[in-house]
């Protein structure tokens, strides 16, 4: 399905809440812009390593349908280890951050990811998920009226916000794990990637099950639940006085 100019213009509106969040954190919470840059930088380095490992390991297993669950789990682990690993590296070299600076770190990741998604026809191009993603987009393109509005615009818009919340929660958990020497928050963050990028994301897209609207609804519900859990975990683990 080819995107119209209206589709492309609407896709860029997903950046508006991120612009508001960045402005709020910078001007109301005195968060320096470099915190957003650090976050997006950690995501970029993590994605580079993730793509190398994906093409070197995960993609070699994609042709065996009987291994899809294991392949999906491996993809989730690779995604979590690379992205969270680079966040951990950044946190190890950065000075102690405030709560809002850690939040900004995650917002920076959500912003750059949303920008890539809004400006790329198919972010999964060149992967084993490219065909399934194209089929999903074509299916949504055949919808009209209310369903087209919901599945073509509202839910994809919501997905970027949900993903940003997951990034904020997981990076917050990684930060807490590093400064408290408690591995449980890190395990929780890794489990979120295992489920979101692996069991839910990779497996369902690879099997083409997201073309079923009921499965698509369950996917968004599952991702929303993960976002709530990791954000709640970050808030609960964060000490009242911070780490300053």
Protein language model regions, located:
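Hydrophobic alpha-helical segments at protein termini of multi-pass membrane proteins
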Residues: 1-244
């Amino acid at each position: 399905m080819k995107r119209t100019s209206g589709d492309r213009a609407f896709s860029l509106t997903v950046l508006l809440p991120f612009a508001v969040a960045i402005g709020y954190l910078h001007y109301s919470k005195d968060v320096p812009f470099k915190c957003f840059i650090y976050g997006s930088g950690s995501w970029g380095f993590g994605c580079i390593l993730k793509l190398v490992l994906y093409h070197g390991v995960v993609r070699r297993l994609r042709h065996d349908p009987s291994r899809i669950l294991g392949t999906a789990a491996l993809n989730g682990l690779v995604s979590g280890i690379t992205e969270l690993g680079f966040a951990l590296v950044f946190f190890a070299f950065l000075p102690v951050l405030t709560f809002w600076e850690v939040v900004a770190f995650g917002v920076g990741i959500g912003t750059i990811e949303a920008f890539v998604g809004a400006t790329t026809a198919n972010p999964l191009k060149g992967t084993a998920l490219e065909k399934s993603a194209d089929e999903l987009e074509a299916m949504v393109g055949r919808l009209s009226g209310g369903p087209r509005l919901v599945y073509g615009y509202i839910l994809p818009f919501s997905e970027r916000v949900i993903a940003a919340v997951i990034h904020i929660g997981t990076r917050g958990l990684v930060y807490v794990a590093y400064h408290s020497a408690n591995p449980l928050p890190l395990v929780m963050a890794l489990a979120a990637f295992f489920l979101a990028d692996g069991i839910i994301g990779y497996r369902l897209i690879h099997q083409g099950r997201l073309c079923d609207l009921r499965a698509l609804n369950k996917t968004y519900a599952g991702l929303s639940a993960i976002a709530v859990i990791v954000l709640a975990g970050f808030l609960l683990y964060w000490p009242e006085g911070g780490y300053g």
